[in-house]
Protein backbone atom coordinates (compact mmCIF):
# COMPACT_ATOMS: atom_id res chain seq x y z
CA UNK A 1 0.00 0.00 0.00
CA UNK A 2 1.05 3.61 -0.50
CA UNK A 3 1.31 4.34 3.22
CA UNK A 4 4.11 1.80 3.72
CA UNK A 5 5.71 1.90 0.27
CA UNK A 6 7.93 4.95 0.14
CA UNK A 7 11.53 5.59 -0.74
CA UNK A 8 12.20 6.03 2.99
CA UNK A 9 11.10 2.44 3.64
CA UNK A 10 13.28 0.90 0.91
CA UNK A 11 15.96 -1.09 2.72
CA UNK A 12 19.25 -1.34 0.84
CA UNK A 13 20.55 -3.78 3.45
CA UNK A 14 18.49 -6.51 1.80
CA UNK A 15 20.62 -6.29 -1.34
CA UNK A 16 23.95 -8.12 -1.25
CA UNK A 17 27.00 -5.98 -0.61
CA UNK A 18 28.94 -7.94 -3.22
CA UNK A 19 30.17 -7.47 -6.75
CA UNK A 20 27.97 -8.72 -9.56
CA UNK A 21 30.30 -10.85 -11.66
CA UNK A 22 28.34 -10.25 -14.85
CA UNK A 23 28.19 -6.45 -14.60
CA UNK A 24 31.22 -5.74 -12.41
CA UNK A 25 29.33 -3.47 -10.03
CA UNK A 26 28.53 -3.62 -6.33
CA UNK A 27 24.89 -4.73 -6.15
CA UNK A 28 23.94 -2.65 -3.10
CA UNK A 29 25.61 0.49 -4.45
CA UNK A 30 23.96 -0.02 -7.83
CA UNK A 31 20.52 -0.40 -6.23
CA UNK A 32 21.15 2.75 -4.19
CA UNK A 33 21.91 4.73 -7.35
CA UNK A 34 18.90 3.21 -9.09
CA UNK A 35 16.55 4.14 -6.24
CA UNK A 36 18.00 7.67 -6.15
CA UNK A 37 17.23 7.97 -9.87
CA UNK A 38 13.69 6.68 -9.39
CA UNK A 39 13.12 9.13 -6.55
CA UNK A 40 14.41 11.98 -8.72
CA UNK A 41 12.05 10.82 -11.50
CA UNK A 42 9.12 11.12 -9.09
CA UNK A 43 10.20 14.42 -7.53
CA UNK A 44 10.66 16.07 -10.94
CA UNK A 45 7.57 14.45 -12.47
CA UNK A 46 5.88 16.17 -15.38
CA UNK A 47 3.28 14.22 -17.38
CA UNK A 48 4.54 15.58 -20.68
CA UNK A 49 8.27 15.43 -19.98
CA UNK A 50 8.89 12.13 -18.18
CA UNK A 51 9.94 9.00 -20.00
CA UNK A 52 8.24 5.66 -19.52
CA UNK A 53 10.04 3.10 -17.38
CA UNK A 54 10.19 -0.68 -17.24
CA UNK A 55 11.35 -2.19 -13.95
CA UNK A 56 12.57 -5.71 -14.69
CA UNK A 57 13.83 -8.33 -12.25
CA UNK A 58 13.13 -11.41 -10.24
CA UNK A 59 10.38 -11.49 -7.62
CA UNK A 60 11.20 -9.83 -4.31
CA UNK A 61 13.62 -7.18 -5.56
CA UNK A 62 11.35 -4.23 -4.73
CA UNK A 63 9.90 -3.33 -8.13
CA UNK A 64 6.36 -2.97 -6.80
CA UNK A 65 7.59 -1.10 -3.72
CA UNK A 66 9.54 1.34 -5.92
CA UNK A 67 6.57 1.82 -8.27
CA UNK A 68 4.28 2.57 -5.32
CA UNK A 69 6.87 4.97 -3.89
CA UNK A 70 6.91 6.82 -7.22
CA UNK A 71 3.10 6.86 -7.23
CA UNK A 72 3.02 8.36 -3.74
CA UNK A 73 5.37 11.23 -4.60
CA UNK A 74 3.62 11.94 -7.90
CA UNK A 75 0.21 11.96 -6.19
CA UNK A 76 1.54 14.39 -3.56
CA UNK A 77 2.27 16.80 -6.41
CA UNK A 78 -1.39 16.68 -7.48
CA UNK A 79 -1.01 14.50 -10.56
CA UNK A 80 -3.39 11.71 -11.56
CA UNK A 81 -1.89 8.26 -11.05
CA UNK A 82 -3.50 4.97 -11.97
CA UNK A 83 -1.83 1.97 -10.35
CA UNK A 84 -3.14 -1.43 -11.39
CA UNK A 85 -2.15 -5.05 -11.20
CA UNK A 86 -1.75 -5.99 -14.85
CA UNK A 87 -3.56 -9.35 -14.60
CA UNK A 88 -6.45 -7.81 -12.63
CA UNK A 89 -6.76 -4.83 -14.96
CA UNK A 90 -6.69 -6.75 -18.23
CA UNK A 91 -8.86 -9.51 -16.74
CA UNK A 92 -11.50 -6.94 -15.78
CA UNK A 93 -11.40 -5.39 -19.24
CA UNK A 94 -11.74 -8.78 -20.91
CA UNK A 95 -14.58 -9.80 -18.57
CA UNK A 96 -16.54 -6.62 -19.31
CA UNK A 97 -15.78 -6.14 -23.00
CA UNK A 98 -19.28 -7.23 -24.08
CA UNK A 99 -21.01 -5.52 -21.14
CA UNK A 100 -23.34 -2.80 -22.45
CA UNK A 101 -22.52 -0.62 -19.42
CA UNK A 102 -19.27 0.39 -21.13
CA UNK A 103 -17.06 -0.44 -18.14
CA UNK A 104 -14.23 -1.70 -20.35
CA UNK A 105 -14.23 1.54 -22.36
CA UNK A 106 -14.28 3.62 -19.18
CA UNK A 107 -11.36 1.67 -17.70
CA UNK A 108 -9.34 2.02 -20.89
CA UNK A 109 -10.11 5.72 -21.25
CA UNK A 110 -9.12 6.39 -17.64
CA UNK A 111 -5.88 4.43 -17.99
CA UNK A 112 -5.12 6.07 -21.33
CA UNK A 113 -5.42 9.62 -20.01
CA UNK A 114 -3.96 9.48 -16.48
CA UNK A 115 -0.85 11.58 -15.92
CA UNK A 116 0.97 8.38 -14.92
CA UNK A 117 -0.08 4.77 -15.45
CA UNK A 118 1.64 2.02 -13.48
CA UNK A 119 1.08 -1.55 -14.71
CA UNK A 120 2.36 -3.94 -12.06
CA UNK A 121 3.36 -7.53 -12.84
CA UNK A 122 3.05 -7.46 -16.61
CA UNK A 123 3.45 -10.94 -18.02
CA UNK A 124 1.51 -12.77 -15.32
CA UNK A 125 -1.82 -12.35 -17.10
CA UNK A 126 -3.33 -14.87 -19.48
CA UNK A 127 -2.19 -13.74 -22.93
CA UNK A 128 -4.97 -13.77 -25.51
CA UNK A 129 -5.28 -12.01 -28.86
CA UNK A 130 -7.70 -9.60 -27.15
CA UNK A 131 -5.13 -8.83 -24.41
CA UNK A 132 -2.47 -8.10 -27.03
CA UNK A 133 -4.84 -5.77 -28.89
CA UNK A 134 -5.88 -3.91 -25.73
CA UNK A 135 -2.31 -3.71 -24.39
CA UNK A 136 -1.00 -2.34 -27.69
CA UNK A 137 -3.86 0.15 -27.96
CA UNK A 138 -3.35 1.37 -24.39
CA UNK A 139 0.40 1.89 -24.83
CA UNK A 140 -0.05 3.43 -28.26
CA UNK A 141 -2.63 5.91 -26.93
CA UNK A 142 -0.36 6.89 -24.06
CA UNK A 143 2.69 7.24 -26.30
CA UNK A 144 0.68 9.32 -28.75
CA UNK A 145 -0.40 11.63 -25.94
CA UNK A 146 3.16 11.82 -24.58
CA UNK A 147 2.11 10.31 -21.24
CA UNK A 148 4.52 8.12 -19.25
CA UNK A 149 3.86 4.55 -18.20
CA UNK A 150 5.74 2.50 -15.64
CA UNK A 151 5.68 -1.26 -16.10
CA UNK A 152 7.00 -3.80 -13.60
CA UNK A 153 7.66 -7.38 -14.62
CA UNK A 154 9.34 -10.53 -13.33
CA UNK A 155 10.08 -11.61 -16.87
CA UNK A 156 13.82 -11.31 -17.27
CA UNK A 157 14.24 -12.98 -20.64
CA UNK A 158 13.08 -11.88 -24.07
CA UNK A 159 9.63 -13.50 -23.83
CA UNK A 160 8.05 -10.05 -23.34
CA UNK A 161 8.86 -9.34 -26.97
CA UNK A 162 6.34 -12.01 -27.92
CA UNK A 163 3.56 -10.09 -26.14
What does each model-identified segment do?
Residues 161-163:
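Conserved small/polar residues in nucleotide/adenosyl-binding loops
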Residues 101-143:
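Conserved nucleotide-sensing/catalytic segment adjacent to the nucleotide-binding pocket
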Residues 72-82:
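Post-Walker A helix-loop "phosphate-sensing" segment adjacent to the P-loop in P-loop NTPases
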